[in-house]
Amino acid sequence: MLQEYNPKNENILIHVNGKLLPRKDAKVSVFDSIVQNGDGVWEGLRVYPEGIVSYDKHLTRLHEGAKALAYEGIPSKNEIKKAIKETLDANGMNTDTHIRLTLTRGEKVTSGMDSRLNQSGCCLIVLAEWKKKVYDFSKGIRAISSSIRRSIPA
């Protein structure tokens, strides 16, 4: 297995919708759109001592994805950066860390597919875990390219 469990992750704090919570308490509602119908956008970020790789590109993609899905109450890039910094600082992380940054449409007032049921705004989750790099790029990586090509939409 390329990814291994790190026992240090047992006691991490996770940012869920403005609160830093212990791993065992970090949960979203069963009425959250990510649970109801998989409605969320996410980015995977890698932390090195020099900083987060392609930080602004990740945040732009997250924002653009949320806008494309017509999310309401999207946190600003500065608000997201603040949540990431708070999470990393609270866990003493500055290297060998992977962040799963997730933005959901938020909690619904009742179950259903209609996005108008989302009345509380987006839910931001910052899950930072101690993880070594998965790929050793000095050896190259194996890639498979599909023979199927999609044309550019008109």
Q: What name fits each language-model region?
A:
Residues 1-154:
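Conserved alpha/beta cores of soluble small-molecule-handling proteins
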